[in-house]
Amino acid sequence: MLRDTHLALQRNWQSLRKPEKLDIEPGADDTRVATIIAEPLERGFGLTLGNALRRVLLSSLHGAAVTSVRIDGVLHEFSSIAGVREDVTDIVLNIKQIAVRMHGDGPKRMTVSATGPCEVTAGMIQTGHDIEVMNPELVICTLDDGATLGMEFTVESGRGYVPAAANRPEDAPIGLIPVDSIYSPVRRVSYRVEPTRVGQVTDYDRLILNIETNGAVTPEDAVALAARILQDQLGMFINFEEPQRLRAEEPRPELPFNPNLLRKVDELELSVRSANCLKNDNIVYIGDLVQKSEQEMLRTPNFGRKSLNEIKEVLSAMGLGLGMVVQDWPPENIEELVKRSDNPF
């Protein structure tokens, strides 16, 4: 009874088709932009997984960001600085866009000093060995001839978006300017779902994720982290234990023939004409097909030499061919063997 219960539980997830292929198509900058394609998925799962992954990618990944800045000679964000074209409000907005990767825990400090005329960029910031600036080309401000500027930044780790007001400590000294912090290393995520085909079945989903990060994490690693977060959050809803003992007691059966013989012919990517001919001849399993001779196949209505060559090529790739003799085919428990072959546990 317990065994039957376990098998009934397992059928809920093991009977669903899982993605067999995950393609990574890098963009112009493969450390920041990529398209990730997962297929095939059961119908409807493309939308389910795509929406969940997108929300987690944008909201839940940890990163690092500037939380406050001190500027020499500046008491508050509504000031202006002699010889600096931007006012402090604009400078703070630019500082918010600095992308950093921090190794270890914060808070950490970064500094920059410059004398005009020049553009002050993020690449001029002096960091320790545990901080990297990911967008050194970012322009923070512009200095006129003879102008000087010194700034000290505080960098911390966190998650999501934190407004400047939350970054102001209660004992903040005069001159400390809090900054809105965008911790998420993921900048943009979009997804779409397209139909894909498995054999003759065309109603499976293909999930296509387009991901752009700030460079602190690659798109491939970002989606892996998002999937792990979802896995961890959903674990609490599982109110039964995995039947590990059952798995040990029921090893994958050893078959007296090539396991591909248990596959159905509609899983083969054959032309519509070839597939219809097999269906009309009541050929269900590859084991049924290989026992047919070439002459028998050519006597099938609408089945020609082109279809014959197509099938021979597909069978050859599996180490099979027409005209084979398979002892005791079909086995009496073929449906059970098919299930165990697809889901060995």
Curated annotation (Swiss-Prot):
The keyword Transcription belongs to this UniProt entry's keyword annotation: yes
DNA damage in keyword set: no
GO cellular-component term (any): DNA-directed RNA polymerase complex
Pfam entry (one): RNA_pol_L
Any one GO molecular-function label of the UniProt entry: DNA-directed RNA polymerase activity
InterPro entries linked: DNA-dir_RNA_pol_insert (IPR011262), DNA-dir_RNA_pol_RpoA/D/Rpb3 (IPR011263), DNA-dir_RpoA (IPR011773), RBP11-like (IPR036603), RNAP_asu_C (IPR011260), RNApol_insert_sf (IPR036643)
UniProt-listed Enzyme Commission number(s): 2.7.7.6
Region (Alpha N-terminal domain (alpha-NTD)) residue spans: 1-241
Ranges where the record places region Alpha C-terminal domain (alpha-CTD): 257-345
Family: Belongs to the RNA polymerase alpha chain family.
Domain notes: The N-terminal domain is essential for RNAP assembly and basal transcription, whereas the C-terminal domain is involved in interaction with transcriptional regulators and with upstream promoter elements.
Record's subunit section: Homodimer. The RNAP catalytic core consists of 2 alpha, 1 beta, 1 beta' and 1 omega subunit. When a sigma factor is associated with the core the holoenzyme is formed, which can initiate transcription.
The protein's name in its UniProt record: DNA-directed RNA polymerase subunit alpha
Organism of origin: Acidiphilium cryptum (strain JF-5)
